């Protein structure tokens, strides 16, 4: 012992004591037991084998794209929670293996993740995972250095893995990896954890020979070593030795001593040591005390844990650390101790009453389920969580976890317990279990679940029987028999309905009629089995039986329970029946249907005129007009049919409608519908005077609510508040319960506010509240624009009163954005004291500070120090001193007060706030404030925790916008001076600036897609002397990089004739260049040459994908399929573009089988390359259409929209291709399907997509007719706005937006559409059209936004025309960002 300590003193000579001493923490889970057998350590084999001649940056760039997000997620998880999941680690590991080029950092991160960061896994499993990762990475060519060996050592210690330290050193030496100080420290820890002081002495000897310092960490491990050797006296004496060596024992030392006492169960010495630490003004963190708890639990002294828990200070981060401790304890079987720690969360959450504490037990319960803890134990913990107020519904959450983990027995036991506690147990709770049994056709498991639920009084419903139970058995009868045989209580009503559905789907109409006509059959609405019955009707030719069933449905009240009565119910059934049949089926069964309709007439079955019209349209589209007269006889005689009900009505003009009104009036017939059409036509033409005249002329006829709504909005658009108010009051007198849509109410508020009629505006707002008008996402934004328009007019009274009403009535939350006009109105007047007082009022009343930055900038510019000090005091009080300092900093920077700004940034204790810094940097970029941004970057150099790469990235973004390569070059120099390691995005941005300005890039650029790093290396070394071979290769690479594929190929052929070979990277570069130019045959020749010269040469992912794209372009689809198959067999990943191009080409050939082959290939990797879920669906449809099988295409897509878990987005692609390929017959049937989905299922996306495609290809009349048949298209605002936005991105598309607005004159987002239309005119340089649009908006009283005005002003100025308004001063980007924030209603409260 004395020799050991003497060696330590010798090494701790002056000059070495001050060196940094990374500690070896004895964290929960750190290793204790070692042996002298190498075991699995054989994986750390000598680093030998083939190493590629040079890295291929194209593959590395793709690698970064494909799984760097996951690595970032892993790193984020560690930083946030201190742990990761096995699933995440395995996913990242799989991605690394698949890519095949692991970097050093990635390997290090994966290895480090296999220790205590996986508290939910057993230690042995964690070690096995580390071994697998090590072996696989080594196999893939990863080069391990000392950091990797040290990481593996740390994992061994944390996982208590037994290994021989001397063997470990030997393996490192064999691999030519020199151990460093950290290696020796961890090897000493390995010996000390075993109590092997002699072994530790050997390692200390190594350190002495290498003149390495003995740090505090070494002494800490010696404390553990002596304690585990049974020598507590020497363990305590280590502290004296440390002091004599000039090292004061730190927290880690005391933790080591406390852990030693804990392993002995010596609670008295633990308490005494803790008191000594406090007396000496030392401090142990909660995480330190958790290590003591871990040791007490493992040593078998749980009775002392509470004493340690009571000493917790609940530091920031306590809960995540305690969670990890709990998980580790539970994994090792100490769940009761873990629960004791968990109960401390109540005290830790005391100061955070945000509801999070009610879910702190989630992780605990989930881990209990994963560890297969018995139900009674889980229940015990649930009760404890409830008592401690750590979970609002612990038993329900435990059930959710057990269902998610497919733990059937535990789930059923928990349901039983829930029932005993009086909690509801619903039938759908068992669906996850039944689904798994359904897949396995496991009748026994299904019966077990049903029986268990039956025993606790839970009866299954029809959905459960139909979807998850009956399909497990051979037939319904056997299902009923087996369930009854096992004593399962079956709800006869639901089971009978399930049986009815089953018989109907089977086509057994006789049994269906028998069941429905049975007096014992339960009362059930037709809607529950309509679909199944339609299927049966289509399969059967028994007209008599179908008529009997229809009559039964009509006359038996059990089946028509809706308030609308049997006319509607049976009518919709008939409509759906015809709708479900293809044209060919309707034509083939024309006579059959005629007989059916006749029998319905004889049975006195009646349908409504509205439903008749729908059936008529279906029959007409199926080309069986003769059947229409057989249906019309079913119409209720009390309803009036016009001539337009028999033939399709043509588009009517105003004069025609007026004539029809006069005719109907003369015949004393109602003409309300025609009058509505006439008014609507005048509204669409913006003819307010004529619309009001028509309304006045026929005032005796009751106008529909929709007519009043259209007139009101027309008057609002024409800034006529008097007529708008009169119409609104008249509507209220006629029908006080009438409710307008949201846009009409907003139009009224806007026009009243604009004209100073505040009381009227407030009355409208009150009505919105009283009538519970639905508030859309855009409503708050509309309120903001109304208030902001008043603020810009300087109308403070209007702003204040309307804002107060909006907030008081609860129509919108008082966000910073909504409150900003309250301040803006004073800023517009230049009244800073009033703006400040309003700001303070908003802060106190609404907890937000709107336009704070603008107010502070005005105060700084004016030099009003008193008001500025008052503002700072308020901000500091409300949001803290840190927020106040940042607000003041940005105000100084914005106004050019850089000396004052620097004083702020040098405030002691100021830390970086990335969100705030990003906000101001992006503001500088938007407003082109280069000087302010440069100063910000310079000032934040020494700001604590400031991400310097981020700051320089912002600066370079502005340099790029200004094409200022000199400032970018200066920034690059400063980056190097500060020793900042720039990220890839920063380097790419910097390289782009240099290249755009014709400057040489002074560094290797991380390449993207198929560009090769070798190319840049060749260019960088162009000045070096080279051999003829290297000169030839360099020439090929340079030409390839410049996309001069033909010249590169000629150079290659010249070298080939001279017998000169190239490197693998040069061949790859040339092949990619030729493929990108479509030189397929030449690329194949180069590929063959490369394979002959270089053994094992293959194309990488990007080049292989490019090969597929080229083969598709040349129509070599079989070759493309073979190439894709070869890629996947070689563990390569195709690009999204390659797969998409191939599938689309197969569809145009009608090759459905080929598409299905590709779909199967992509099943496991489709999500990783972000393949659209609609790619295969759309192209299968298209393949069916190309084959002439329209019905199959419709059968493929329709269930996807009508299913319960529909995730279908858009079939716009299919519509477009059908139009391009002139498939009019198919298009007509697709149109019928889209309209059917809209009318029957309220699924409007398909019909809206078709409408927009008609506009896109210029088929305006078709779009108009479709809109007339399906008016709901006009209400699909998000889809329509998206179409307008996309159109505005492409030059020459203004007409599309104009056509859309012409077709939908009442479009709710008209202001947005006008803004995009102005963008089109600006792109097309069409100043005349832009001016006309501006005048049109003024005539409609539509206020243009600032981005609109900015675009118009620039356009007019460039055209040499005068600008008739004050041009907004900021940049386009500034106003675009502002609009985005307004739209999302997410304006940052601090700004």
Curated annotation (Swiss-Prot):
One Gene Ontology term, aspect cellular component: mitochondrion
A GO term for molecular function: DNA binding
Annotated InterPro entries: ARM-type_fold (IPR016024), LRP130 (IPR033490), Pentatricopeptide_rpt (IPR002885), PROP1-like_PPR_dom (IPR033443), TPR-like_helical_dom_sf (IPR011990)
Domain of life: Eukaryota
Protein's UniProt keywords contain Chloroplast: no
Entry keywords, A to Z: DNA-binding, Mitochondrion, Nucleus, Repeat, RNA-binding, Transcription, Transcription regulation, Transit peptide, Transport
PROSITE patterns, A to Z: PPR
Localization in the cell: Mitochondrion; Nucleus
Chain positions covered by the region annotation RNA-binding: 1118-1387
SUPFAM superfamilies: ARM repeat
Transit peptide range per the UniProt entry: 1-42
PPR repeats: from-to residues: 110-144, 145-179, 180-214, 215-249, 250-284, 389-425, 704-738, 741-775, 779-813, 815-850, 948-982, 1028-1062, 1063-1093, 1100-1134, 1310-1344
Function: May play a role in RNA metabolism in both nuclei and mitochondria. May bind mature mRNA in the nucleus outer membrane. In mitochondria binds to poly(A) mRNA. May be involved in transcription regulation. Binds single-stranded DNA.
Protein name: Leucine-rich PPR motif-containing protein, mitochondrial
């Amino acid at each position: 012992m004395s020799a050991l300590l003497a060696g330590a003193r010798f090494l701790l000579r002056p000059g070495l004591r001050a060196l940094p001493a990374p500690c070896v923490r004895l964290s929960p889970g750190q290793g204790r037991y070692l042996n002298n057998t190498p075991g699995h350590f054989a994986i750390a084999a000598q680093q030998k084998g083939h190493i590629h001649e040079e890295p291929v940056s194209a593959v590395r760039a793709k690698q970064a794209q494909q799984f760097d997000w996951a690595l970032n997620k892993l790193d984020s998880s560690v930083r946030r929670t201190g742990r990761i999941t096995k699933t995440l680690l395995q996913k990242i590991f799989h991605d690394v293996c698949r890519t095949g080029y692991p970097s050093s950092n990635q390997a290090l991160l994966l290895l480090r993740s296999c220790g205590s960061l996986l508290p939910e896994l057993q230690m042995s499993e964690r070690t096995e995972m580390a071994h697998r990762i090590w072996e696989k990475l080594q196999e893939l060519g990863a080069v391990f250095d000392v950091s990797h060996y040290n990481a593996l050592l740390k994992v061994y210690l944390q996982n208590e893995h037994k290994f021989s330290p001397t063997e470990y050193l030997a393996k490192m030496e064999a691999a030519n990896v020199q151990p460093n100080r950290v290696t020796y420290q961890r090897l000493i820890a390995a010996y000390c954890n075993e109590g092997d002081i002699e072994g530790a002495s050997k390692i200390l000897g190594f350190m002495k020979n290498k003149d390495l310092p003995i740090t505090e960490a070494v002494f800490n491990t010696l404390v553990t070593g002596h304690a585990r050797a049974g020598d507590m006296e020497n363990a305590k004496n280590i502290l004296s030795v440390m002091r004599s060596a000039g090292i004061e024992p730190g927290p880690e030392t005391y933790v080591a001593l406390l852990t030693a006492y804990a392993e002995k169960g010596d609670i008295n010495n633990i308490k005494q040591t803790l008191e000594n630490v406090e007396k000496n003004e030392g401090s142990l963190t909660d995480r330190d005390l958790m290590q003591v708890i871990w040791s007490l639990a493992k040593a078998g002294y749980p009775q002392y844990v509470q004493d340690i828990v009571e000493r917790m200070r609940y530091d920031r981060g306590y809960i995540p650390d305690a969670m990890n401790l709990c998980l580790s304890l539970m994994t090792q079987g100490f769940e009761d101790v873990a629960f004791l720690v968990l109960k401390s969360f109540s005290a830790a959450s005391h100061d955070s009453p945000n509801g999070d504490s009610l879910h702190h037990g989630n992780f605990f319960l989930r881990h209990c389920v994963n560890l297969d803890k018995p139900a009674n134990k889980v229940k015990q913990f649930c009760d404890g969580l409830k008592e401690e107020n750590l979970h609002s519904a612990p038993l329900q959450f435990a059930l959710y976890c057990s269902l998610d983990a497919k733990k059937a027995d535990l789930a059923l036991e928990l349901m039983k317990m829930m029932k005993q506690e009086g909690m509801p147990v619903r039938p759908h709770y068992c669906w996850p279990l039944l689904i798994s049994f359904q897949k396995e056709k496991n009748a026994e498991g299904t019966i077990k679940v049903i029986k268990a639920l039956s025993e606790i009084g839970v009866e299954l419903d029809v959905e459960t029987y139909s979807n998850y139970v009956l399909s497990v058995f051979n037939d319904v009868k056997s299902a009923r028999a087996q369930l009854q045989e096992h004593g399962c209580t079956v709800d006869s009503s639901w089971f009978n309905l399930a049986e009815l559905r089953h018989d109907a789907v089977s086509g057994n109409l006789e049994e269906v009629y028998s069941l429905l006509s049975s007096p014992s059959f339960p009362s059930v609405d037709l809607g529950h089995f309509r679909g199944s019955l339609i299927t049966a009707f289509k399969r059967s030719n028994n007209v008599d039986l179908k008529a009997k069933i229809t009559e039964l449905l009509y006359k038996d009240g059990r089946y028509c329970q809706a308030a609308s009565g049997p006319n509607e119910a049976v009518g919709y059934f008939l409509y759906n029946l015809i709708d479900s049949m293809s044209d060919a089926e309707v034509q083939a069964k024309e006579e059959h249907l005629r007989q059916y309709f006749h029998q319905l007439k004889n049975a006195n079955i009646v349908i409504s005129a509205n439903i008749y019209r729908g059936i008529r349209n279906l029959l007409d589209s199926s080309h069986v007009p003769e059947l229409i007269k057989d249906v019309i006889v079913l119409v209720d005689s009390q309803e009036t049919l016009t001539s337009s009900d028999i033939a399709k009505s043509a588009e009517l003009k105003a004069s025609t409608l007026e004539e029809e009104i006069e005719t109907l009036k003369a015949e004393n017939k109602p003409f309300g519908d025609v009058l509505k059409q006439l008014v609507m036509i005048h509204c669409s033409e913006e003819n307010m005077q004529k619309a009001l005249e028509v309304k006045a002329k026929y005032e005796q006829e009751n106008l529909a609510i929709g007519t009043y709504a259209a007139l009101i909005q027309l008057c609002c658009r024409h800034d006529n508040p008097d007529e708008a108010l009169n119409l609104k009051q008249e509507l209220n007198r006629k029908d006080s319960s009438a409710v307008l849509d949201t846009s009409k109410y907003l139009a009224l508020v806007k026009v009243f506010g604009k004209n100073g009629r505040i009381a009227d505006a407030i009355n409208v707002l009150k009505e919105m509240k009283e009538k519970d008008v639905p508030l859309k996402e855009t409503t708050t934004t509309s309120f903001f624009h109304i208030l902001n328009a008043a603020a810009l007019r300087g109308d403070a009274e209007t702003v204040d009163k309307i804002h107060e009403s909006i907030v008081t009535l609860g129509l919108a939350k008082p966000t910073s954005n909504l409150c900003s006009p309250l301040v803006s109105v004073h800023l517009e007047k230049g009244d800073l004291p009033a703006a400040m007082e309003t700001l303070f009022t908003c802060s106190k009343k609404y907890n937000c500070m709107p336009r704070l930055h603008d107010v502070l900038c005005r105060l700084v510019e004016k030099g009003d120090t008193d008001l500025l000090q008052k503002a700072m005091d308020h901000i500091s009080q409300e949001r803290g001193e840190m927020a106040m300092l940042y607000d003041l900093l940005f105000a100084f920077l914005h106004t050019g007060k850089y000396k004052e700004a620097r004083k702020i940034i040098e405030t002691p204790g100021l830390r970086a706030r990335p969100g705030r810094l990003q906000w101001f940097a992006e503001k500088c970029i938007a407003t082109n404030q280069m000087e302010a941004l440069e100063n910000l970057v310079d000032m934040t150099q020494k700001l604590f925790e400031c991400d310097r790469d981020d700051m320089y990235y912002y600066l370079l973004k502005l340099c790029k916008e200004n094409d200022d390569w000199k400032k970018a070059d200066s920034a690059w120099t400063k980056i190097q001076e500060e020793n900042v390691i720039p990220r890839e995005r920063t380097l790419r941005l910097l390289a782009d600036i240099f290249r755009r300005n014709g400057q040489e890039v002074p560094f290797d650029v991380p390449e993207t897609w198929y560009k090769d790093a070798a190319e840049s290396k060749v260019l960088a070394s162009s000045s070096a002397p080279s051999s003829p071979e290297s000169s030839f290769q360099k020439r090929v690479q340079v030409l390839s990089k410049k996309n001069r594929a033909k010249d590169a190929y000629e150079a290659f052929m010249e070298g080939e004739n001279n017998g000169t070979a190239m490197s693998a990277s040069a061949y790859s570069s040339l092949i990619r260049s030729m493929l990108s130019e479509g030189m397929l045959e030449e690329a194949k020749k180069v590929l063959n040459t490369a394979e002959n010269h270089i053994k094992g040469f293959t194309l990488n992912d990007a080049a292989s994908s490019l090969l597929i794209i080229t083969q598709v372009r040349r129509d070599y689809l079989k070759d493309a399929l073979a190439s894709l198959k070869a890629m996947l067999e070689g563990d390569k990943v195709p690009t999204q573009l390659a797969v998409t191009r191939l599938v689309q080409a197969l569809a145009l050939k009608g090759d459905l089988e080929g598409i299905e082959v590709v779909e199967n290939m992509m099943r496991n990797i489709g999500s990783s390359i972000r393949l659209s879920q609609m790619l295969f669906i759309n192209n299968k449809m298209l393949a069916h259409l190309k084959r002439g099988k329209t019905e199959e295409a419709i059968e493929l897509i329709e269930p996807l929209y009508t299913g319960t878990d529909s995730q279908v987005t858009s079939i716009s692609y299919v519509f477009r291709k059908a139009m391009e390929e002139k498939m009019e017959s198919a298009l007509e049937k697709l149109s019928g399907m889209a309209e059917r989905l809209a009318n029957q299922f309220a699924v409007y996306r398909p019909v809206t997509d078709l409408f927009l495609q008609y506009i896109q290809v210029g088929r305006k009349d078709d779009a108009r007719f479709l809109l007339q048949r399906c008016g709901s298209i006009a209400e699909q605002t998000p889809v329509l706005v998206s179409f307008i936005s996309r159109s505005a991105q492409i030059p020459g598309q203004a007409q599309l937006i104009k056509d859309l607005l012409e077709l939908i004159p009442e479009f709710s987002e008209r202001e947005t559409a006008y803004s995009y239309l102005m963008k089109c005119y600006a792109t097309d340089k069409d100043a005349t059209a832009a001016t006309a649009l501006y005048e049109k908006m003024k005539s409609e009283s539509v206020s243009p936004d600032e981005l609109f005005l900015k675009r118009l002003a620039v356009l007019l100025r460039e055209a040499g025309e005068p600008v008739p308004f004050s041009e907004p001063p900021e940049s386009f980007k500034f106003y675009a960002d502002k609009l985005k924030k307004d739209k999302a209603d997410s304006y940052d409260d601090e700004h």
